[in-house]
């Protein structure tokens, strides 16, 4: 299965095309736009990923947008909550068409990136981040293609 992983609408937009565990393409938007920490995807980046990997079978986005909007609502960030431009399904339609988008937890995205690029068959993983959807710190146990969350610290608590 060919998977296109996307991080956008935050800082450091990036994509990775993976097939059966092999990275076919990976790139950051700032390399294409020249804008440091660019949050927007651009057409050339996506075109390169499709040129190297073809059309993906699945598109995976790095966070769950409705949980993030709920956190923004609770934090009083009403402009962000009401904006549809920062919804991945709206933002990505020009890039991935009607492809179904699977949303995974922000901290699980970090955990997977660390685990799948490590040489270990099983691992404990600690993710400490300013904030994901609600989580600020998580501890995972991973083996094979399984991830089990063992601990979670939630917003507004953070290290």
Regions found by a protein language model. Name each.
Residues 1-159:
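Short acidic/glycine-rich loops and adjacent helix/strand connectors
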């Amino acid at each position: 299965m060919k998977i296109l992983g996307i991080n956008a609408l935050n800082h450091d937009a990036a994509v990775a095309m993976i097939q059966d565990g092999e990275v076919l393409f990976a790139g950051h938007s700032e390399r294409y736009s020249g804008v440091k920490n660019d949050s927007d995807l651009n057409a050339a980046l996506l075109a390169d990923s499709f040129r190297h990997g073809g059309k993906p079978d699945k598109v995976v986005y790095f966070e769950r947008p409705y949980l993030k909007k709920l956190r923004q609502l609770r934090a009083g960030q009403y402009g962000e909550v009401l904006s549809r431009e920062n919804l991945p399904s709206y933002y990505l339609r020009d890039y991935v068409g009607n492809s179904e988008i699977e949303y995974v937890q922000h901290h699980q995205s970090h955990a997977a990136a660390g685990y799948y690029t490590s040489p270990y068959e099983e691992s404990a993983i600690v993710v400490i981040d300013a904030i994901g959807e609600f989580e600020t710190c998580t501890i995972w146990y991973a083996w094979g293609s399984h991830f089990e969350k063992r601990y979670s610290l939630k917003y507004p608590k953070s290290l």
